[in-house]
């Protein structure tokens, strides 16, 4: 390997454009072993090209701004397929900024200051958010406040900003099951969580259930473009 500055000083920038074959290796991602022994999953440029079909003006589950006005918050391991696609690849492909959490202790503070337009969280993160809200607003009290129109609107606005989701156009979960009751709970706060299903082997996303749909318990949504089931 090379240190970054040694790499810059030792190698000249590539002058000509590089056009890989679709069968060339795009990246290798090592899995945690969910489906067996941990292994390096080889993804080629054809897979990457298919991923691009998931974000078009007609089909845009991440609500990406094609003019590059996107903001992402990175906290998962960078070799996690969801982090690689939803945050890294999407930002590199369509433009935007990526902000990184400083530590576990500063996660909430960092997210609150960034207010990303796209946020991906595993279900455990949303459970922690929920527990934090309920520690200050027990469910009975929360229900009462949400039943008062003016108070409800103000409370939803305050909570979304406190969570760091006030500017989020897409709020997504995946990598583990999320209970439908939890998605409904968040929807009552004005937070629509899109549920995605995928694996490292199929480049993160093969189905997705839009956040506004909460009447299909146990569903992971419809197959995405270029996905065969």
Feature annotation, model-predicted:
Residues 25, 31-34, 72, 77, ...:
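Conserved S/T- and glycine-rich ATP-binding loop of Class I adenylate-forming
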Residues 2-5, 23, 46, 76, ...:
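Structural detector for helix-capping/boundary residues
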Residues 49-74, 78-158, 167:
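Conserved AMP-binding/adenylation subdomain of ANL enzymes
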Residues 46, 124-127, 176-177, 181:
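Alpha-helix/helix-capping structural signal
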Residues 26-53:
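Conserved AMP-binding A3 loop
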Residues 1-22, 134-162:
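ANL superfamily adenylate-forming
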Residues 119, 155-229:
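Conserved AMP-binding/adenylate-forming
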């Amino acid at each position: 390997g090379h240190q970054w500055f040694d790499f810059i000083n030792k190698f000249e920038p590539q002058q000509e454009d590089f056009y890989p074959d679709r069968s060339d290796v795009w990246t290798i991602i090592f899995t945690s072993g969910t489906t067996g022994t941990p292994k390096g999953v080889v993804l080629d440029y054809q897979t990457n090209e298919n991923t691009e079909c998931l974000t078009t003006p007609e089909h845009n589950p991440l609500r990406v701004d094609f003019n590059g006005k996107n903001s992402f918050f990175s906290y998962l391991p960078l070799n996690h397929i969801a982090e690689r696609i939803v945050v890294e690849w999407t930002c590199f492909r369509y433009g935007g900024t990526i902000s990184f959490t400083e530590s576990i202790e500063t996660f909430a503070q960092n997210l609150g200051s960034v207010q990303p337009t796209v946020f991906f969280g595993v279900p455990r993160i949303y459970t922690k958010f929920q527990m934090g809200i309920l520690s200050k607003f027990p469910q009975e009290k929360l229900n009462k406040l949400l039943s008062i129109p003016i108070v409800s609107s103000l409370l939803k606005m305050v909570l979304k900003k406190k969570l760091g989701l006030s500017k989020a156009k897409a709020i997504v979960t995946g990598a583990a099951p999320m209970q439908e009751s939890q998605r409904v709970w968040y929807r009552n706060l004005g937070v629509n969580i899109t549920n995605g299903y995928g694996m490292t082997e199929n480049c993160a996303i093969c189905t997705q259930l839009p956040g506004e749909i909460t009447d299909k318990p146990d569903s992971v949504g419809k197959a995405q473009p270029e996905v065969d089931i």
